[in-house]
Amino acid sequence: FAKDGGPDAGSELADSLESGDASQAKEVLHRCGAVLGNYHTEVEDVRTTPPDPRRWNARLASLEESLRADLIWRAPFTRDVPCMLSLGDVRLSDTVGQTVRIGRPRIADCLNEPNCEFPAIRDLASLVHDLSRIHHNHGSELDIVELRSSLIDGWRSTAPEDWCSTDAFYAHRGGLAIWEYEQCMLDVIEAVSNQSGAPEPAVTILRHVRGFQKRMFNNRTLGALSIMAAFFGISSVINQFPPSIDELAMPILFFIASVGFFLSYRSLSPPPERPITHSV
């Protein structure tokens, strides 16, 4: 997608943040998300391969090791995030009108070269993190949650249905958050290489990762209760097989409880529009 004339979206957003024009900022972000989604729809049939959680997790481990970080974040990921022709480092300044350009690889990718392909949601995470940078650099008082929501909604409006599904954004299995975590580590790696000081908001976001993970870990209590209730329901049926009408009451209650606990567990997953810094 070639870059045409006119102001880029990064400049448009910066002007909107400076003037405090929330509606204009949301319009720019929604358009950027839609342009990125259109790109992903165009390349969906060109080449996709199955998700690669082993290499993705190994990359996160490598970045953590490079930074000697005291953080560890791994995820099982979902089937709705296949590898595709990723744009890599995506910035709002890469979008002009209805086009998006392929930018240069970032320095961090040269210092820690990827040995894997990436899903579309990683491109989105790169764009969302660029929004966080611009929002922070301009000291904007506009609600970052609403701005992120506009960008994500724009992407969802044009991206392949499976790639932007609820499961793809499910934070308990990685979602958007874990790729934002990767973007923050890449920012820090570049800052260390350039000796340019602590990069914000990356450093602040990384400080909140542990609390974000703790919240998700605590949510697993409901997941465990769901599994236990299902186990007791199955055990009751097996022990009383073939069960009578009266004997079915208890297993049914266990199964209903299992479904209730599971739905509650899923509902506690942090929504993608809420930043890691707002989820603690």
Where are these regions (language model features)?
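Extended charged low-complexity segments that act as oligomerization/scaffolding linkers
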Residues: 1, 26, 47, 142-149, ...
